[in-house]
């Protein structure tokens, strides 16, 4: 009964049209969640969310706890980690060429191109390319921190801190409630003409070998 009542509590936000998700390609909801991760993490340069952790679109209408659980059913924890730009580029290049869920980024534009038969990622902030040795503070979740980001962290994870960190649902609930109303077609989350992570083709990206 307690759990049922908790899931029925209103989330404080209302959607005007569904905020759509996607697994293979960039979509509004993972981008929005990456934005909120960054906003919820003091000092974060980047927000990074995995589309595989977003299970349904955010439907139109009032957001209740049950819907929030359905969108993010996993108890992933919100973490702040540090990686160099070169490491983040490597993670994004590998993801672009893979078949797992795409990664959603906030705070940077990640331009993915083919160069000499290899996948190249250029990270830009306000139009300027970041040098490889730039250290970035990334707001993400423990799934990514223990997975593709792990080998690129500037310092090892503190497992006690991971266990004490809030779940994504708890961390983002307040952020979502403060927004009041969401438009499913809001170009801040996804603009097909100006994606956050433009690619030379659909995932998995395959770069032809140089002649």
Mark where each language-model region is.
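Glycine-rich phosphate/diphosphate-binding loops and the adjacent beta-loop-alpha structural elements
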Residues: 8-28
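Feature captures C-terminal
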Residues: 27, 31-211
């Amino acid at each position: 009964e307690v759990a049922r009542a908790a899931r029925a509590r209103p989330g404080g936000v209302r959607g005007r049209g569904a905020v759509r998700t996607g697994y293979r390609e960039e979509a509004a909801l993972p981008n929005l969640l990456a934005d909120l991760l960054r906003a919820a993490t003091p000092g974060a340069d980047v927000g990074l969310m995995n589309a595989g952790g977003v299970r349904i679109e955010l439907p139109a209408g009032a957001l209740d706890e049950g819907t929030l659980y359905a969108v993010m059913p996993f108890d992933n924890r919100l973490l702040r980690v540090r990686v160099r730009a070169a490491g983040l580029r490597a993670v994004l290049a590998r993801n672009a060429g893979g078949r797992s869920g795409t990664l959603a980024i906030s705070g940077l534009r990640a331009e993915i191109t083919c160069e000499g038969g290899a996948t190249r990622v250029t990270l830009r902030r306000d139009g300027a390319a970041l040098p490889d040795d730039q250290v970035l503070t990334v707001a993400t979740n423990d799934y990514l921190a223990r997975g593709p980001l792990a080998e690129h962290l500037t310092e090892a994870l503190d497992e006690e801190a991971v266990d004490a960190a809030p779940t994504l649902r708890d961390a983002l609930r307040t952020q979502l409630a403060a927004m009041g109303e969401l438009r499913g077609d809001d170009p801040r989350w996804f603009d097909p003409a100006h994606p956050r992570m433009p690619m030379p083709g659909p995932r998995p990206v395959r770069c032809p070998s140089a002649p």
